[in-house]
Amino acid sequence: MKKHLLFLGPPGAGKGTQAAYLSEANSYLHLSTGELLRKEIDLDTYLGKQVKDIMNKGELVSDQLVLEIVNKNLSKDNKGWILDGYPRNLSQVNSLNEVLMNINQPLEIVFYLDVPDEVLIKRLLLRGRKDDNEETIKTRLKIYKETTEPLIEYYKNLSLLEYINADGDLKTISNDIKQKMA
């Protein structure tokens, strides 16, 4: 079974939900950059205040900041890990590849959770996070299409990419992912 996983997909695709389920079922480390950043905001640290301002505008947090957080967490002892929401652009992919090479834990599979935009907007509005309003959501989807979608082709070319139809019920999606992990 593969144990070094990455979840790609637009905001609201269910990356966090599926990653949390799999990490609990397999005792894997779940690295959600969104959750790590929100934790900084909740603690109201200097860094958290900067992150909050950036996220409220629907913009992405700097590559260097996110890489530091990810590197620190990947270095912990673990049975496996799931990256959720990182990397988001090709520059981050290159930085992540260096980190993974240094810790000798290569990425084994990338799941792309595919969901239509209208479903994403509805899901995001329903989850009720402070940073989820329609204008911010549309900005985030636009940024995603510009910066993150090229990663799909990158990982496809490395034969690491697995498409997941994530416009369905949680159990069906989870079963599809588990079958492809074997």
From Swiss-Prot:
Entry-linked Gene3D superfamilies: P-loop containing nucleotide triphosphate hydrolases
Residues binding ATP, per UniProt: G12, A13, G14, K15, G16, T17, R127, G168
The protein's Enzyme Commission number: 2.7.4.3
SUPFAM superfamilies cross-referenced by the UniProt entry: P-loop containing nucleoside triphosphate hydrolases (SSF52540)
PROSITE patterns for this protein: ADENYLATE_KINASE
InterPro entries registered for this protein in UniProt: Adenylat/UMP-CMP_kin, Adenylat_kinase_CS, P-loop_NTPase
Region spans: LID: 126-132
Any single GO CC term annotated in Swiss-Prot or TrEMBL for this entry: cytoplasm
GO biological process: AMP salvage
Oligomer and partners: Monomer.
Notes concerning its domains: Consists of three domains, a large central CORE domain and two small peripheral domains, NMPbind and LID, which undergo movements during catalysis. The LID domain closes over the site of phosphoryl transfer upon ATP binding. Assembling and dissambling the active center during each catalytic cycle provides an effective means to prevent ATP hydrolysis.
Name of this protein: Adenylate kinase
Source lineage: Bacteria, Bacillati, Cyanobacteriota, Cyanophyceae, Synechococcales
